Amino acid sequence: MDLLHAALLGLIQGATEVLPISSSGHLILIPRLLGWPDSGLTFDVALHFGTFLAIFVYFRKDVVSLVQDGLTGFFQPEAPRRLRLPWMIVLASIPAAIAGKTLEQPIEELFRSSPLMIALMLILFGLGLGLTDRYGKKLHDVASITLGTAMLVGCFQCLALVPGVSRSGITITAGLLLGLARTDAARFSFLLSLPIVFGAALLKGLHLLKHGIEPGMAMPMLVGVAVSAVVGYISVAFLLKFVQSRTLWPFVWYRVAAGIGVMALLGVGLLS
């Protein structure tokens, strides 16, 4: 893999992992359209680690506070909800962790060979995001999240295994559906992603330690990590600022247009 190829994949991952437009869908469709070879497990680890770094660094103060609150709340059974939030995030990550461990490979294999299904997921779940953004009550903030709300958002996160759904998209949709304000739904989505993205990178990293890094992949990995981390950080900052004063419908229209575009390419034989 050359460095330009690595940088482009890092750019795609950094933007689409964070924005509600589906990283897995883009990372399947774009290389397929351009005739790029499979990037392999080594590079996949690099991309996931890069986006984890982006989210972790952006929310570093929140992470420190969550750890402190979690340790305090653990020893206080009647602790305020704010002190229980870290444990809610951990518990809400369990459904997606189990689903990812058992279903990720068969789901990805199924959808990797079906651009049409990815296109349909882009459109369907994009419209779901738009409808919840328009009609959601938007009454609650992150501090008011209950365990039930957190677990429901965590269960919705399992759907992100399907390429075209989008992890951030489905968790923001769930948050809006359950009454979170738009900014708080996005913030909780990112906090909830940290255990999952870190866990995915860790498991694949352990696999690499066991089997070794492919020859010639060290520099492309570094480039992929750097680009996905920088672009991911910028994308987090952009999205959180964007949702303070704007709706999520621009992302909905993008998803619908992308889905229709994929169908058109399939129809004329430029994508198969």
Curated annotation (Swiss-Prot):
InterPro entries given in the database record: UppP
TM spans (from-to): 39-59, 87-107, 113-133, 145-165, 188-208, 220-240, 251-271
Catalytic activity, as annotated: di-trans,octa-cis-undecaprenyl diphosphate + H2O = di-trans,octa-cis-undecaprenyl phosphate + phosphate + H(+)
Membrane topology designation: Multi-pass membrane protein
Alphabetical keyword list: Antibiotic resistance, Cell inner membrane, Cell membrane, Cell shape, Cell wall biogenesis/degradation, Hydrolase, Membrane, Peptidoglycan synthesis, Transmembrane, Transmembrane helix
Annotated localization: Cell inner membrane
Gene Ontology BP terms: cell wall organization; peptidoglycan biosynthetic process; regulation of cell shape; response to antibiotic
Pfam families: BacA
Broadest EC class assigned to this enzyme: hydrolase
The keyword S-adenosyl-L-methionine belongs to this UniProt entry's keyword annotation: no
Gene Ontology CC terms, in alphabetical order: plasma membrane
Molecular function terms from GO: undecaprenyl-diphosphatase activity
Keyword S-adenosyl-L-methionine listed: no
EC number of the protein: 3.6.1.27
NCBIfam families, alphabetized: undec_PP_bacA (TIGR00753)
Function field: Catalyzes the dephosphorylation of undecaprenyl diphosphate (UPP). Confers resistance to bacitracin.
Cited HAMAP family: Undec_diphosphatase
Assigned protein family: Belongs to the UppP family.
Note from the entry: Bacitracin is thought to be involved in the inhibition of peptidoglycan synthesis by sequestering undecaprenyl diphosphate, thereby reducing the pool of lipid carrier available.
Name the UniProt record assigns to this protein: Undecaprenyl-diphosphatase
Originating organism: Trichlorobacter lovleyi (strain ATCC BAA-1151 / DSM 17278 / SZ)
